[in-house]
A protein has these predicted regions:
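Conserved active-site and cofactor/substrate-binding residues in soluble primary-metabolism enzymes
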Residues: 19-23, 48-52, 86, 90, ...
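Predominant activation on well-ordered alpha-helical scaffold segments within soluble catalytic domains
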Residues: 26-29, 54, 58, 68, ...
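Active-site flanking residues adjacent to catalytic metal/cofactor-binding acidic residues
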Residues: 42-45, 106-108, 147, 189
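Gly/Ser/Thr-enriched, mixed-charge loops and adjacent short helices
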Residues: 1-98
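Short, charged, surface-exposed secondary-structure boundary motifs
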Residues: 74-79, 134-136, 176-181
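Phosphate-binding and adjacent anionic-ligand microenvironments
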Residues: 102, 140-228
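Short hydrophobic/aromatic-enriched beta-strand-loop microsegments
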Residues: 61-68, 122-127, 163-171
Length: 228
C-alpha cells in the first residue's frame, strides 16, 4: 500500500486561508430590510452560529438580547436542540421577562431553529414552516411547499388555504433537498426545525439565514406573534 511503502507523491503546492464570514453576513444583510423595529432574544445554544447570527440580526436593525452565543463544545447551558421545550426553558422565560417580540433558538451547527412567541410558547416546526410559507405565497402563489411526514395536517391545509401546493415527503435533509430540486419547490421544512430555502437563498437549511428571514417577515406584520 502507498502508506506502508511511503510512496507518496512529491512536489510543492500552495495553501491559502479565506475568511468567508464577512461575505456570508453581507449576503444575508443584502436580502432583507425590517419594516419596523423588532426585539429578539437569541439563544445560540453555545453552538457555531450564535455570535454570527446575533451580529447579523443587530446589523439588520433588530434589538438583540443574546444568550449562550459563545461557542462551547461542552454545551454547558443546555443541549442545543431548539425544538425540545426542556432545552428552551431559559429562552422561553427570557422572552417573557424582556417583553420581546419573539425568541430564536439555534442548534449546534446552525441548520435548525426554534421560534418562541412573546407568551413564551415554543412553536412546533410545522407552525414555523407555515409562517414562512404564508409570506412566500403572497409573492409566489401556487408554489410547492414540501414538509416531512412528521408535520400535521394543519400545515398542509394551511398551505392550501393560502394558495400553495403542499407536498408530504420523507424525513431527512438530503432527501428533502433532492426533492426540492426535482420538483422546483422554493421552500421546505421538517418538524425538527430544518427549514430549506430555495427562494432568495441557495436551497439548503440555514438557521442563521432563516432567523433573518423570520425577523424580516415578522416585522412586516401589524400583529404580535401570538396572532399570526
Amino acid at each position: 500500500a502507498i502508506f506502508e511503502e511511503g510512496a507518496f507523491a512529491e512536489g510543492t503546492g500552495t495553501a491559502s486561508r479565506i475568511d468567508i464570514i464577512p461575505t456570508y453576513k453581507q449576503d444575508i444583510l443584502s436580502r432583507f430590510k425590517l419594516a419596523r423595529p423588532v426585539k429578539v432574544v437569541l439563544d445560540g445554544g453555545n453552538g457555531a452560529g450564535g455570535e454570527i447570527c446575533a451580529d447579523i440580526l443587530t446589523k439588520l436593525g433588530a434589538t438583540v438580547i443574546p444568550m449562550f452565543c459563545e461557542p462551547d463544545g461542552d454545551f454547558p447551558n443546555h443541549h442545543p436542540d431548539p425544538v425540545v421545550e426542556a432545552n428552551m426553558q431559559a429562552l422561553m422565560a427570557r422572552v417573557k421577562e424582556e417583553k420581546a417580540d419573539l425568541g430564536i433558538g439555534l442548534d449546534g451547527d446552525a441548520d435548525r431553529l426554534g421560534i418562541v412567541d412573546p407568551d413564551g410558547r415554543l412553536l412546533f416546526g410545522d407552525e414555523v414552516l407555515s409562517l414562512y410559507a404564508r409570506e412566500l405565497l403572497t409573492r409566489k402563489p401556487g408554489s410547492t411547499v414540501i414538509a416531512d411526514v412528521k408535520c400535521s395536517s394543519r400545515l398542509f391545509n394551511d398551505i392550501k388555504a393560502h394558495g400553495g401546493t403542499p407536498m408530504m415527503w420523507t424525513t431527512g435533509h438530503s432527501i428533502i433537498k433532492a426533492k426540492m430540486q426535482e420538483v422546483g419547490a422554493p421552500l421546505a421544512g421538517e418538524m425538527s426545525g430544518h427549514m430549506f430555502f430555495a427562494d432568495n437563498w441557495y436551497g439548503f437549511d440555514d438557521a442563521i439565514y432563516g432567523s433573518a428571514r423570520f425577523v424580516a417577515l415578522f416585522s412586516a406584520q401589524d400583529k404580535p406573534m401570538t396572532e399570526l
